[in-house]
Each structure stands twice: as C-alpha cells, then as structure tokens.
Amino acid sequence: MVNDRWKTMGGAAQLEDRPRDKPQRPSCGYVLCTVLLALAVLLAVAVTGAVLFLNHAHAPGTAPPPVVSTGAASANSALVTVERADSSHLSILIDPRCPDLTDSFARLESAQASVLQALTEHQAQPRLVGDQEQELLDTLADQLPRLLARASELQTECMGLRKGHGTLGQGLSALQSEQGRLIQLLSESQGHMAHLVNSVSDILDALQRDRGLGRPRNKADLQRAPARGTRPRGCATGSRPRDCLDVLLSGQQDDGVYSVFPTHYPAGFQVYCDMRTDGGGWTVFQRREDGSVNFFRGWDAYRDGFGRLTGEHWLGLKRIHALTTQAAYELHVDLEDFENGTAYARYGSFGVGLFSVDPEEDGYPLTVADYSGTAGDSLLKHSGMRFTTKDRDSDHSENNCAAFYRGAWWYRNCHTSNLNGQYLRGAHASYADGVEWSSWTGWQYSLKFSEMKIRPVREDR
C-alpha cells in the first residue's frame, strides 16, 4: 500500500508538472524526512549493537548474537532485517515519506521492542542458569570458611593425638625398663633371702643338736606322734608288703606297679617301685617327665592323688602320710635338665604330717632334714610348712604362692623349689613358676625330669 501510494503520488506529480520542463528543488520537508529516517536507522542499529554487546558481556560462550542487515526494498524505501539465533527473521520496512512519520516512528518502536524481546528470550535460559550457579557459588563461599576452620581443628587434634601417642610410647618404654629392673632386683633379693634362710636353718639345726635332739618329748608330742623307727628286714607281719622295700625283700626286682598296704592304711593302694636306684626299694610319689599331666590343681586332687603311676603322677598327701608315719623314711630326688644333665638330692629324714592328729586339717606339714647330694639343697627351707594349693592358702606370703607360681607345694614365702610347677621346657621368661630346683638351675629354668621317692631307713644303713 505504501508503495502504491508512493507511486500514485509520484504519478500525480508528473501529471501536474508535465507542462513544466524545469526540474524542481527538494523541499525542506523532504530533507527533514530523510534526516529523520537516517537517524531512525542509526538508532535501531545502535540499540541492536548495544544489546548484542551486553549479551556477549554477560553470557560469554552462549549462542551467536542476532544479525542485523539493511537494504533497499525499492527505490524509495529501506528494509531492516534481524536474523535471530533460532534462524527466524524479523523484517522492518521503513517509508521515508514525510506524511507517514508517525507510522514510521511506531514501526521503529515496534521493531525495537521486537528486538529487545528476542534478545530477552535468547538470554532468559542462560541468565536463569547463571543465577543458579551464582547462588551455588555464594553458598559455597559461605561454607568454605567453616570447612577450612574445621580442617584446622582436625589438624590440631591430630597433632595432639600424635604427641600423646609419642608420650605414651615413651612411658611404656620406661615402664618396660622399670619392670625389667624390678624383676632383676626381685631375683637377686630372692637369692639373698634363700641363702639367708638356709643359713638361719643351719644355725637352728646346730642349736637343736647342741641342746640334744634325744631328750624326751613333751606329753603332747608323745600323744600325737606315731611310733617310728628303723625298718627290720622282711615284712613285719604276714605276706602283705607295706611299701616297695617289702616288695623288694619279697623277691621282686623289676621296676613297676605294685600294691602296698601301709600299717595305717590297711585297704592298701598301688604305687610305682624303683628297684634299681641305690639298691632299690624306693616308693615313688611324684614324677614329671613330659608335661602330659596338669599339676596346677586344687586341694582335693593333691590330697587324693592324680596322674598315671607309670608316667607323670602325684601319689596323694594322705597316702604319703600313711607311708611315712609307719617308720623312719629317707627321701631321694632325681633331677634332669634338657641338656641331659643329671643331679640328685638326698635327705636322711622325711615325713608328711608326722605329728598331726588330723593331718588334713593341719595341712600335711613337711618334715625334712640331713641333706646330701649333687643338686644342692632346695627343700630344707620348706621344712615345717603346710601344703598350699591354689584354692587353699597355708603359706606365709601375703599372696597365695601356689596361685602366683602356678603349682602346689610346702611354700613358705614363697619357695626355693617348685617341682609341681608348670612344665615350661627349659629356660623361660616368667619367674619361678616352672619345675624349679633353684640351687641347681635357678628360678628361670624348668626341668625336664623330676622324681621324688622314699624308702625306710634300714638297720644296716
């Protein structure tokens, strides 16, 4: 329509001016319209460029900006084309005729609005994403100082723990050193104490001999003590042997298990007889040889006996008492270490519960004297002491020596021998809780073999 109108007006002008051959000069209105049209085009281009610049500044790396191009629609009109990012086109036709300036400005404003709307739609999604990213960055910025502070606290705590660990390690090393020193001091003290006790025992024995051991006993002793003397040859009455010496005298010469019938134990019991050591006739009441039997037991087991007579065993306190109260007995102790070294200890007098009306209530006290042998004396210290087990404490120590040294014995405070201790197979780190005979191998060596056996003192000895 605009073009038709333009053509019509041009035709009219030509009809009116046909008689005139002289060309007319452009009017002021026409110049003004041309200037305004140029300004409008420049304004549109400037606005579009500014928006595109802002779009590139705030959303780098997004879709390419709209492309604005201009051109002539006809000889008397201009065409502005905007190509959007989605390949759609926006065309604006600009009419330079002065009579329609209002419409031209309206179209210009509409074009500007269209351009702005297109740019807004183009930037909407990236800006939304940018806002979310900015919000996330703000949140992270707020949390970062807290995380750094917590990391610093954890690092401080870690350093403190490392320092504490180092202090504990130093303390533990010091305690271990102190423990070793105390063990050494205890071992030395135990040795000094053993020598002191042995010396005192020797002095007391000498004093007793000086005062005369053959003096009559007081009335109480005579009432309590059974008659004990040397054994005559052969069995006392009948054919029942009272111990292994009677078995030997009856003609049996082989080691083995035999039945004996002590004077105060007429029901009798079986024992192992050693028929070879120093003439034979020995009744065995204790043997350790391989660790197959547990010797860390309570009172009832040690009273009644346990184990195998042909292997490791303990005959029982009540049976040892029955044997040693019917005559005067001597004790022989055989020992062997794990290097096949051997030694022995002999005691000319031995008895269990000799002066007791109720030996179990009295704790089966030990009587032993007159040492000789190659192993050294480790038993005289225990003479006069009651038997102690882990569940019946009769020693002179503040602690239960049986529980502490893992055995059962006539402990005093605590021991110089512990033949019923743990079978530890030679040298051991623990202190005095093995099969010990301290005068021969010390307190930290557990023997391979021990055997305790008794025999009556005969007239010809």
Swiss-Prot record:
Any Gene Ontology CC annotation: membrane
Fibrinogen C-terminal domain segment(s): 235-458
SUPFAM superfamilies named in the record: Fibrinogen C-terminal domain-like (SSF56496)
Protein keywords: Calcium, Chitin-binding, Disulfide bond, Glycoprotein, Membrane, Metal-binding, Signal-anchor, Transmembrane, Transmembrane helix
Transmembrane parts of this sequence: 34-54
Residue ranges annotated as Extracellular topological domain: 55-461
Residues annotated as glycosylated: N340
Domain of life: Eukaryota
UniProt keyword Transmembrane present: yes
Compartments, as annotated in UniProt: Membrane
GO MF term set: chitin binding; metal ion binding
Membrane topology: Single-pass type II membrane protein
Assembly and binders: Homotetramer; disulfide-linked.
Protein name in the entry: Fibrinogen C domain-containing protein 1
Gene designation: FIBCD1
